[in-house]
Amino acid sequence: MKKAYGGVVVSPTGQILLREPAGHYKGDVWTFAKGRPEADEAPERTALREVLEETGCRAEILGRIPGSFETSRTVSEYFLMAPLENTARFDGETQAIRWATPDEARRLILLNERPKRRRRDLRVLKRALALFQSLHGSLRA
């Protein structure tokens, strides 16, 4: 299995940053930034780089989201992140970005075509929100 690392960026008010992959790659309509590490790249560095490249958001890591999340060929791990700066520039792998409330994020993730990827992203979202709440108290969104 290949490894990938990504980030769930959550604003101080509990808004979730989602990306719309170009051409809805692999059936993903809205998802989180993630990707494979470059040579000798640490998981945290990979996640920060992928978030910046795919969303244009510079972020800082708040903590590791518990668990690993498997699809057919990849095991992904995610980090909870706080936004630092939005550069408004993202790579060609992304056609749009969007901030969403937790409920909106759930609805957007349900648009993904592949059930396994939908389940993965819903699990990631649930665990990210639980970690966010443990660090910051209840959501104010």
Protein language model features and the residues they cover:
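Nudix hydrolase/Nudix homology domain
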Residues: 25-29, 91-141
